[in-house]
């Protein structure tokens, strides 16, 4: 599970920031930067903050369209945390345009399958699928934290794809066994003694790659 969490964290940070940092006890800290354009990470400024707008008269459509225009391709999904959802759903004009009765979308269902407990599909805003995510990870101090920082809105496309890359395992036993390309290298060994002990370990060197970081636009909503 620890390896899966590293993969998830790399993938999430690649989407949120267009880069992430790799750290470890046995190698120097490395920043993996995919070269996202500055305009694809947006922070709402004073006067533009949704929290400052009138709930009955403000229409967020114009802002959302401007944000989507920053993406390198078509945007068809908006993923947000609960804070952003509550703000958006608080606007009367947003609620009037939100379509919660449209038929299912097989591609969207595939994108969020097996995530029913932490992902909620709210409906369509025009052609934009509205999804609230509550996915989390376990931090180094043992506490559970959300992958999406509070007030985060991610705009992207359900067809966007990353690449799972894996480095070589520096393990003499793996080399002696003629290890082939794989995402995991499990091993076990015995220690002599009374009692004898058996140990197991799984090694991996993941590197999640986002070929086009500008496919996504990330907005800090305030």
Please report, for each region that a protein language model flagged, where it lies by residue:
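Sequence/fold signature of self-assembling virion shell proteins
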Residues: 95-96, 100-222
């Amino acid at each position: 599970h620890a390896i899966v969490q590293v993969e998830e964290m790399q993938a999430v940070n690649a989407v949120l920031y267009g880069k992430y940092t790799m750290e470890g006890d046995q190698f120097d800290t490395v920043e993996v930067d995919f070269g996202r354009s500055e305009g694809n990470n947006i922070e709402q400024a004073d006067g533009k903050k949704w929290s400052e707008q009138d709930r009955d008269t403000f229409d967020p459509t114009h802002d959302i369209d401007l944000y989507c225009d920053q993406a390198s391709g078509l945007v068809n999904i908006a993923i947000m945390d609960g804070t952003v959802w509550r703000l958006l759903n608080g606007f009367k004009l947003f609620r009037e345009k939100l379509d919660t009765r449209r038929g299912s979308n097989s591609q969207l269902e595939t994108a969020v399958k097996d995530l029913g407990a932490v992902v909620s599909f709210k409906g369509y805003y025009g052609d934009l699928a509205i999804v609230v995510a509550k996915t989390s990870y376990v931090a180094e101090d043992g506490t559970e934290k959300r992958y999406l920082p509070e007030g985060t809105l991610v705009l992207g496309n359900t067809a966007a794809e990353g690449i799972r890359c894996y480095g070589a395992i520096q393990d003499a036993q793996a080399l002696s066994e003629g290890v082939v390309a794989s995402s995991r290298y499990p091993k076990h060994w015995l220690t002599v003694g009374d009692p004898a002990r058996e140990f197991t370990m799984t090694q991996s060197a993941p590197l999640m790659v986002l070929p086009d970081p500008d496919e996504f636009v990330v907005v800090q909503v305030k």
